[in-house]
Amino acid sequence: MRAALAVAQQASASGDVPVGAVIVNSSGEIVATGHNERELNNDPTAHAEIVAIRKATQALGQWRLEDHTIVVTLEPCPMCAGAIAQSRISTLVFGAWLSLIHI
């Protein structure tokens, strides 16, 4: 979670909602990170989870991320939850419930 929080600060610096995501393999090694890039790239789908999933699949050369964990600072929205399920990520850890944050 510390790594995800550090990545979230990068989103804040670029004017985005400070959400960070980290994908780790079964050994606990970081495979990819992502932060919100909606403002940075004018892309409404560039949420932290989506960015991290895209980077992980490119780095690993496959779209199935079985036996991987995604750690996110904020509960995933429905779009991101769907992407997490579709990429077969086995474990999700998040730091705060979306319904408790007013963004």
Predicted regions and their residues:
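Short, basic/aromatic recognition patches
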Residues: 1-14
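Local cysteine-cluster metal-coordination motifs and their immediate loop/turn environment
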Residues: 73-87
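Short secondary-structure boundary segments
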Residues: 96-97
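A short, polar/charged loop-to-alpha-helix boundary motif
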Residues: 40-51
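Immediate flanking context of iron-sulfur cluster ligation sites
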Residues: 62-74
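Conserved small/polar residues in nucleotide/adenosyl-binding loops
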Residues: 101-103
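Short beta-strand scaffold segments in enzyme catalytic cores
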Residues: 19-24
